Every structure is written in C-alpha cells, then in structure tokens.
C-alpha cells in the first residue's frame, strides 16, 4: 500500500491567511511560513494583529466558508484516492480546515487544533 501526503494551503486551496488579509484589509496578515519559518513566532504575531483589530475565530471562519478549492483540486484528490491512500498534512487548524474538507470530499487530514 502507498500513502501520498499533500499540503493543504497553496496546493489544494488558496492560502487562508492571504484570503483573510484581503477580506479584512489587513495586509500584514499576508505573511506565511514562507516569510517567517518559526511557526510559533508567526502565530503569536498574527494573534497580536487580530487582537489589535478586534478580530477572532468567527471572522476567520466566515472568510474560510467562502474559500473554494483550487481548480481541479477535488477531482485530483478523487483520482488519487482511487489508487492510493491520500493524507493531507497541514499546519492549519481543524477549526479552519473543516469547511474546506467538506468541499474536497472529506479527505483525511492531519493538523492541529485550537482546543
């Protein structure tokens, strides 16, 4: 048996924080792990910016609900799962990923939780 592992953001769906940055009008939130590889430092920085603007999980989830998979992503996953086990491994949160997983046909995802 083979297992194929994929990232989520930038591979199957657009970058969540970039989408939220565009909707919220806060350009600083465009920063990703490509810009700041220290994940803990990046997340603390993001949380500080969210607090400064009075934003929280509900507003982020509202934006995520409007995000669609990249063109062909669901079809690609469907074909991949016909021949191998496909697992998404991501640094996103369960609370962010759930609506996206529904749109992708509920693939297996390993990620972190805010709980």
Residue ranges, per PLM feature:
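Alpha-helical substrate-recognition element adjacent to the catalytic core
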Residues: 2-113
